[in-house]
Regions:
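Extended interfacial segments that mediate partner engagement and assembly in macromolecular machines
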Residues: 69-136
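General N-terminal targeting signals
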Residues: 39-41, 116-118, 123-124, 151, ...
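Residue-level detector of secondary-structure boundary/capping sites
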Residues: 15-18, 50, 101, 125, ...
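Residues in flexible loops and secondary-structure boundaries
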Residues: 32-35, 39-41, 67, 107-109, ...
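Generic structural hydrophobic/aromatic packing signal, biased to beta-strands
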Residues: 22-27, 31, 59-62, 66, ...
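Amphipathic alpha-helical interaction surfaces
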Residues: 65-68, 116, 120, 144, ...
Length: 173
């Protein structure tokens, strides 16, 4: 069990520049939403549009490919990707609630938070960080065991992470 968790102060949008794992609308397998591959080469500033950058949906099982043009308002609803509105792949029921994550790094952050004995807020005050907005049932130490079991269930059904950091930036040393 981690001793400490330090809030990295990111919002839910900070997880959108990485792979978002979704259910393919055609074959129901695991598909991936990423920043469109041509986006980085077409602009001098890759971070210019951030969460509003063009996206691509690809399913390696059935070869479905779709594009989202970007620059429009993102639809943000729980357990769906904000670009194509597809159900997230990384989700499961947990004590009458739905536990979900956009991708591996998001799931890692949730696990780090839940396992920590001590949870520290970030240096800046405010309530806009994703961690500060987690639901009460997920934050409760009483639900720790059940939430960790749900995270393990999600991981068992997840495809391997393409890039796994050596250590999580959310863990305090």
């Amino acid at each position: 069990m981690n001793e400490r968790f330090r809030d990295p102060r990111g919002t839910w949008m900070s997880f959108l520049d990485e792979e978002i794992l979704v259910r393919c609308p055609d074959c129901q397998g695991c598909a991936v939403v990423t920043v469109h591959p041509r986006y980085d080469t077409q602009t001098a500033e890759p971070s210019y549009l951030g969460a509003f950058a063009p996206r691509r949906l690809v399913c390696s099982a059935c070869l479905l490919a779709r594009e989202w043009p970007g620059k429009t308002i993102i639809r943000h609803t729980d357990a769906r990707d904000p670009y194509f509105g597809l159900p997230l792949w990384l989700q499961t029921r947990c004590g009458g609630n739905l536990l979900w994550a956009y991708g591996h790094r998001h799931l890692d952050l949730l696990e780090d938070y839940v396992t920590a004995r001590h949870r520290e807020r970030g240096a800046r005050p405010g309530s806009m960080s994703m961690v500060e907005r987690l639901p009460t049932w997920l934050k409760s130490a009483r639900n720790r065991s059940e939430v960790l079991k749900a995270i393990r269930r999600i991981r068992r059904g997840a495809p391997p992470s393409r890039h796994r950091p050596e250590s999580s930036p959310t863990r305090a040393d």
